[in-house]
Design a protein with these regions (language model features):
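Active-site substrate-binding loop(s) of clan PA
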Residues: 18
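Asp-based, Mg2+/Mn2+-dependent phosphohydrolase catalytic module
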Residues: 4, 8-15, 24-25, 30-71, ...
Length: 158
């Protein structure tokens, strides 16, 4: 939830963004089709995740001059590991990740207790992976990016 609104906010803030996936051809195009045109889509890199190649390739496409402040946001553990391997800040998406094992409709049908259990398990697994922050969904990204900015001001590195 909140993905398109968050992307609009990032665009207003002039934050360059890329979409990374491992799909090729028509599948990749179908997955990226709802995204705004200003988002650079990256498909199929020579080395599969968790190699850092996809992240570095995306940063080169975005013409990023430094890794400082670059953030990867995903619910996919292998892509998050790729971001960690590339030296990026990483934010894991708990409730909309493959770690929860349900789609949005199934999630909404779960009891509050079952949602909390799945959210907690996904959060623990994401932190065990080594991500820097975990949020439930993209609607919380602004606050999370502000937190990372404060951590960077204190000298913390990914």
């Amino acid at each position: 939830p909140g993905a398109l609104q968050t992307l609009d906010w990032l665009n207003q803030q002039r934050v360059p963004c890329a979409w990374l996936d491992e799909l090729g051809g028509a599948d990749a195009e179908r997955m990226a089709s709802p995204l705004p045109g200003w988002i650079k889509a990256q498909h199929c890199t020579p080395a599969p995740w968790p190699a850092p190649d996809a992240c570095w390739h995306a940063l080169m496409t975005l013409k990023t001059g430094t890794l400082d402040g670059c953030v990867l946001v995903s619910g996919e553990p292998r892509l998050l590991q790729s971001g960690l391997n590339a030296g990026l800040w990483t934010i894991g998406l708990a409730t909309c990740s493959s770690l929860c094992g349900v789609d949005r409709q199934q999630w909404q049908a779960l009891s509050a207790q079952e949602q909390e259990r799945k959210r907690g398990n996904a959060t623990l697994q994401l932190f065990a992976l080594g991500v820097h922050s975990v949020i439930d969904h993209l609607e919380s990204l602004g606050d999370c990016l502000a937190d990372i900015a404060q951590r960077r001001l204190k000298g913390e590195k990914p």
